[in-house]
Amino acid sequence: MAADVFMCSPRRPRSRGRQVLLKPQVSEDDDDSDTDEPSPPPASGAATPARAHASAAPPPPRAGPGREEPPRRQQIIHSGHFMVSSPHREHPPKKGYDFDTVNKQTCQTYSFGKTSSCHLSIDASLTKLFECMTLAYSGKLVSPKWKNFKGLKLQWRDKIRLNNAIWRAWYMQYLEKRKNPVCHFVTPLDGSVDVDEHRRPEAITTEGKYWKSRIEIVIREYHKWRTYFKKRLQQHKDEDLSSLVQDDDMLYWHKHGDGWKTPVPMEEDPLLDTDMLMSEFSDTLFSTLSSHQPVAWPNPREIAHLGNADMIQPGLIPLQPNLDFMDTFEPFQDLFSSSRSIFGSMLPASASAPVPDPNNPPAQESILPTTALPTVSLPDSLIAPPTAPSLAHMDEQGCEHTSRTEDPFIQPTDFGPSEPPLSVPQPFLPVFTMPLLSPSPAPPPISPVLPLVPPPATALNPPAPPTFHQPQKFAGVNKAPSVITHTASATLTHDAPATTFSQSQGLVITTHHPAPSAAPCGLALSPVTRPPQPRLTFVHPKPVSLTGGRPKQPHKIVPAPKPEPVSLVLKNARIAPAAFSGQPQAVIMTSGPLKREGMLASTVSQSNVVIAPAAIARAPGVPEFHSSILVTDLGHGTSSPPAPVSRLFPSTAQDPLGKGEQVPLHGGSPQVTVTGPSRDCPNSGQASPCASEQSPSPQSPQNNCSGKSDPKNVAALKNRQMKHISAEQKRRFNIKMCFDMLNSLISNNSKLTSHAITLQKTVEYITKLQQERGQMQEEARRLREEIEELNATIISCQQLLPATGVPVTRRQFDHMKDMFDEYVKTRTLQNWKFWIFSIIIKPLFESFKGMVSTSSLEELHRTALSWLDQHCSLPILRPMVLSTLRQLSTSTSILTDPAQLPEQASKAVTRIGKRLGES
């Protein structure tokens, strides 16, 4: 029988030399030629039609590589071939293949019989095939039609062998009426066969079009889909994978020129042997599904294939700022941390911005203009006259500071020789009248104070001039300040910075002592001659997105035909005399209202003081002038300790003064005292931009007005969000529970239906309930009417009865009732069924006592007959017995638990006996 089963497998060809010529790369166990090889018959010797395909010719001697091979017989078409054209054709031979593997012998010969005279040769590859068939068809088969063995990695010749075996098994079972050990067929139309035998055990869970939902099968199908095109390319190239790009280009031109070759279906492609190319691919899809690791953000600058259109994927990369010029960002980490620690408790919100190191000029010089620069227009009343008090003697010795080229924030600009000072008109004196002290060669105190007070700007008689803390004088100043005017806009970009400065103008910040009349201290900026060497270090603004609206006044940049000296008066701010030793100064004016966001102070390599007040309080009736002052220490002080940087963003408050805030800084550096309204950004009608906190990572910019959100507000927001989420979950749970209840009420089956169908059936169900309720209400109304009619009839009948009945004494009546109860008790204790009988006859006893009279024998005879006629007839007894049984069923457990009825009967007669004893 085993021979009959395995005869369907293709036999090894007799011409090995031709096999080598045609398919040198296929091993012997994968040979699929259908030329038969003779085998000795089994011990049974039964010749069956299953051997019709076997050849009885004796095997010729095997031809060596140099022998002449005999002519090959024409191939036999088996049943499993069906409509497959050229099922034995394999891909062309590859270069450098080992031809010795073709001559490998995989056939195993088995000897059996008493004298081992019978031999049977079985191909070893059939074992694997039948294992696959057992795995795929572990149940019963229905028909011998062609089976694709979906989900199994089989080649076409293996599928043909398996289908031949299945067809042979069907032939043996139905035509030869014999059993076979491989496959068994059942007929669904046969009534004796259980229907469950046709069900595949793997078909319990379906997934898409596959009837087996194992992950290995899904991965294998994914590999087929992934490697199909690459295998198509391998038809046109050798094993050298380096020529894959050239083949891609060749196929691309073939596509546009000669057109594509007609694609072969994936299942019929002879190249779909996934063992060949799985080593060339790294499976990343299912490995990431199993590990559940978060995908890292790709760095587009590390991708080598940015030029290939297939590698470019859409994303948020164009929205990211360019970080190439932020290579040296480490010095600002301490700046952020120290600023939050120092000023965290002073202001409700702080906005930190990276302040660059003035010693680090970048390699980019072309951002700043060097020729035509705008001038600054100021009111005439604010410009100092040429006859102002003598300025402090300034040391004109220039300072050339060293710089690092890797810092991209600092823009150096060389200044040429300064021009003569600009003459200013007289009206400056009434506003700023202060004598100037002579310079002192001694160094200033350790902690000078730089108060910043927003007073009324243009009022000649200010109502409340503030006092200053520690007014100092300029010591031996070895610096040459410069002035930069900076026009702020809503959005600052590094492409077109709105920055203008005077290239050939050096200005000296001079201060005056307060007059005895306590006039408001002002700041006069006068030009001074500078040597051609000092360099102004310019802080290039980083792109910052300012939210909160557009500024009130438009920003204009007026170009000048030539560099002109500029004289500036800083308005809306008071800067007390402070000592700056040995460093050149720069003043940057920023036009535009800025809300006070916070204070930033940290220690950097050079002493920098950044002061940016804007739109501070003004006197009534005076037009508002928005300005900001940036005082930057630009010197290269080798002997002085590092000084902090403080940036003040004043708010657009309307009240004159607020609480004074004093910020102590590190030793040796000037102190900055801020006196101003200490409150958050007011929600006023005017639009004023808010500076956003520049975080180190450009991925997460914070565009809120406050650079650092309040933890209480964050906690409240999270609490409110959690409440919203909880309420939403409760709402959805209630809706789901109500729909489940509706489904349980309106539908008998457990099949899930849509909400629309559920609501429609609910409406129908409610309508039916309303109709039933109306019918019940109508029935109750009708029954009430009948009860009223019956009560009226009973009352009318009772009115017709006589007022007196049979003359029976009360004592005699009670005595007869006691005798009846005693009799019932005695008989019930003997047999509990008598208690049921006593309940039935008790109405008869009552009627007997009322009708029968014992006054005389004739009267007794007459009343007894009358009682029998009236109360003992069947029409009277039937409803009486029925009512008695109804009372029995309601007062006892005769219907629910009849076993307790004897106990209840004994208890009833016992109660009757106790009542008799008490009476």
Curated annotation (Swiss-Prot):
Listed Low complexity bias regions: 44-56, 686-706
Domain (bHLH) ranges: 719-769
Phosphoserine, modified sites: 9, 27, 33, 39, 669
Chain segments carrying region Mediates heterotypic interactions between MLXIP and MLX and is required for cytoplasmic localization: 832-881
Tissue: Widely expressed in adult tissues. Most abundant in skeletal muscle.
Keyword Ligase: no
Signal peptide: none
Any one GO BP annotation for this protein: regulation of transcription by RNA polymerase II
Region of interest (Transactivation domain), ranges: 322-445
Predominant cellular place of this UniProt entry's protein: cytoplasm
PTM-bearing positions, type N-acetylalanine: 2
UniProt xrefs under Pfam families: HLH
Organism of this sequence: Homo sapiens (Human)
Annotated spans, Leucine-zipper: 769-790
GO molecular-function terms, A-Z: DNA-binding transcription activator activity, RNA polymerase II-specific; DNA-binding transcription factor activity, RNA polymerase II-specific; protein dimerization activity; RNA polymerase II cis-regulatory region sequence-specific DNA binding; RNA polymerase II transcription regulatory region sequence-specific DNA binding
Disordered: region residues: 1-72, 542-562, 633-712
Subunit structure: Efficient DNA binding requires dimerization with another bHLH protein. Binds DNA as a homodimer or a heterodimer with MLX.
Keywords carried by this UniProt record: Acetylation, Activator, Cytoplasm, DNA-binding, Membrane, Mitochondrion, Mitochondrion outer membrane, Nucleus, Phosphoprotein, Transcription, Transcription regulation
Protein name: MLX-interacting protein
Region: Required for cytoplasmic localization, residue numbers: 73-327
Subcellular location: Cytoplasm; Nucleus; Mitochondrion outer membrane
Composition-biased stretches (Polar residues): 670-685
Transmembrane feature ranges: none
